[in-house]
Amino acid sequence: KQDGSDEYNIDPIKWRVLSNEKGVQSDNGDELFLLADQNLDVIRYHETNTSVSVTWAESTMRSWLNGYDASYNTGGNSGIDYSADAAHSFLDSAFSEEEKNAIAGTKVENSTGGETQVQIFLLSLSETRRTVYGFSRDISKDPGRVATNTAYVAGGGKTGSTLMSEEDGADIWWLRSPGLTGDYAAFAYNDGSVYSNGSHVNNENFAVRPAFKLNLEEVLFTSAAVGGKVPDASGSGNCGGVAVGEIFEIASYDGDDWKVTVLDKDRKFAISDVEISGDTVTFSYSGARTGKNEYISAVIVTNGELTHYGRVLELDGTANGESGKNKNVSIPSGMTLDADTELYLFNEQYNGG
């Protein structure tokens, strides 16, 4: 959305789950197949001013989505470099390093033959017709394929198009499949129908709706998209506030929107010298990351379900640093840690409830 300075804020991206591939045999283990819930940018399928035949593998779209250098595409005279900095590619501008580590490399089939290995991709024509993904088999109008615009897209996005619909209005979005000829690519209409004949690859008025597969082994836990890290006001025990140092019962949630907390394997956080006395857990720690919004946090898992959360120690680099001894965590009153109820401590960057 735009702020008062006419600049666009970087809001969290909402992703639609097309399939839960937990337990499905794949190269990466358990995965979620995700598609952007809205159109996220406006960009040509291929950056060219001439009529050239191009495949998905050679397109500047694939390079821009994944931050590839000029050797991966045939844009311009000798390829276009999208690896220089975060402003150049979708991958680097939309995801942190930790989030990128949770994106599974995916082999996507190309209708022109062969496969390409990518992290971020566009849906194919056939994928937009699979009922298991929530789409209609028919190529005609389908509400499940309708994609609305973010404020950035409504404002013209990367190409500066003046023909985009308003914010939350529906627009056309690219597919990776080729169109009728080699210089055309397929797309989905703003009414949810799909058009296999496609449009010219240098069309600057079509939106982008990226997709990727999330490696669930890189996910620490999930929480409600709104209120997932805030207390249940009707709960019992130590759940009346959000102050640092408290572990509270997480509010109940029956919605469909979730956010994930991903692992950061570069962190060297470790816990030692753990002692439990009544409702108090005493511990020492080392290898913590300090700075803005850095904390030692805790979750309690009961019978496999996440029930409690709290930020127990602020690591601002002043009072608490990279290591510490004899720190305390208070377990909610009436709760006992055992084989069915476990406490986990971890170092996180807190980005809101």
Q: Regions from the language model: what does each represent?
A:
Residues 1-337, 347-350:
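Collagenous Gly-X-Y triple-helix signature in extracellular proteins
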